Curated annotation (Swiss-Prot):
Gene3D superfamilies: GHMP Kinase, N-terminal domain. InterPro entries: ExoRNase_PH_dom1, ExoRNase_PH_dom2, ExoRNase_PH_dom2_sf, PNPase/RNase_PH_dom_sf, Ribosomal_Su5_D2-typ_SF, RNase_PH, Rrp41. One of its GO terms (molecular function) is RNA binding. It is found in: Cytoplasm. GO terms for biological process: gene expression; rRNA catabolic process. NCBIfam families: ECX1. It comes from Thermoplasma acidophilum (strain ATCC 25905 / DSM 1728 / JCM 9062 / NBRC 15155 / AMRC-C165). One of its GO terms (cellular component) is cytoplasmic exosome (RNase complex). The keyword Ribonucleoprotein does not apply. This is Exosome complex component Rrp41. Keywords: Cytoplasm, Exonuclease, Exosome, Hydrolase, Nuclease. CDD domains: RNase_PH_archRRP41.
Length: 248
């Protein structure tokens, strides 16, 4: 269905530019702010293209009910939710199969980066609320979630940072737009820990060749260097603002 519709809509023009004017390896604008919620242990807000996502972190705290505890390490519970007004057609409130699947893969990705062994019998709750959706929400939410965890002071082996790539009109492109996600031939979200290059999330929707997959991975790995810098700047800016406030 996706490939049939792609034939009807031209997503790459004769100048090899995408519908939004970007080149093949160009990111959409990204802005991250840390420490935006006073009542959460840690929080972050991200705008990535048209995505607007808020993340709140609570914990580590004793896991409840007790039968859910793991004696060896903390349990990371990510809850990804799309607000009813986040998409063009009003979304029915509450979890569905897609949001449950995304919550699971984000929980697993964050568990790989957090030093969960330091907190036996504990849980860390990560609430990801999509206020406005514009393709790539799972990666944007995960990228903001790791900033919120750092804001909460949760010990981590490394931050998690990710991006998407995909196949559009036969070309591999970085950071799919909404139209490219809907009508392109393939979508590949990947998240890594930059220090080691370990992949903590990788999925694929659509068909690509082996060479195209490696091309997508190269594009994403290069993009994560830029996105990782934006994450660090968000955390540094929070403490700069605090220092200015205390100085006054």
């Amino acid at each position: 269905m996706k490939r049939m519709e792609a034939n009807k809509i031209k997503l790459i023009n004769e100048d090899n530019l995408r519908l939004d004017g970007r080149s093949f390896n160009e990111l959409r604008p990204i802005k991250i702010q840390a420490g935006v919620l006073n009542r959460a242990d840690g929080s972050a807000y991200i705008e990535w293209g048209g995505n607007k996502i808020m993340v709140g972190v609570y914990g580590p705290k004793e896991a409840y009910p007790k039968h859910s505890q793991d004696i060896d390490h903390a349990i990371v519970k990510a809850r990804y939710n799309m607000a009813a007004f986040s998409v063009d057609e009003r979304k029915r409130p509450g979890p569905d199969r897609r949001t449950m699947e995304i919550s699971k893969v984000i929980s697993e990705a964050l568990s790989s980066s957090i030093m969960i062994e330091q907190f036996p019998r504990a849980e860390i709750d990560v609430y990801i609320e999509v206020l406005q959706a514009d393709a790539g929400t799972r990666i944007a939410g995960l990228t903001a979630a790791t900033v919120a965890l750092a804001d909460a002071g949760v010990p981590m082996r490394d931050m998690v940072v990710g991006c998407t790539a995909g196949k559009v009109d036969g070309h591999m492109v970085l950071d799919l737009s909404k139209e490219e996600d809907n009508y392109g031939e393939a979508d590949i979200p990947i998240a890594i820990m930059p220090k080691t290059g370990d992949i903590v999330l990788m999925q694929m929707d659509g068909d690509v060749t082996e060479d195209e997959l490696y091309q997508a991975m190269d594009m994403i790995f290069e993009a994560t260097k830029r996105i990782s810098q934006i994450q660090r700047e968000a955390l540094l800016n929070k403490y700069k603002i605090q220092d200015i406030g205390e100085g006054e």
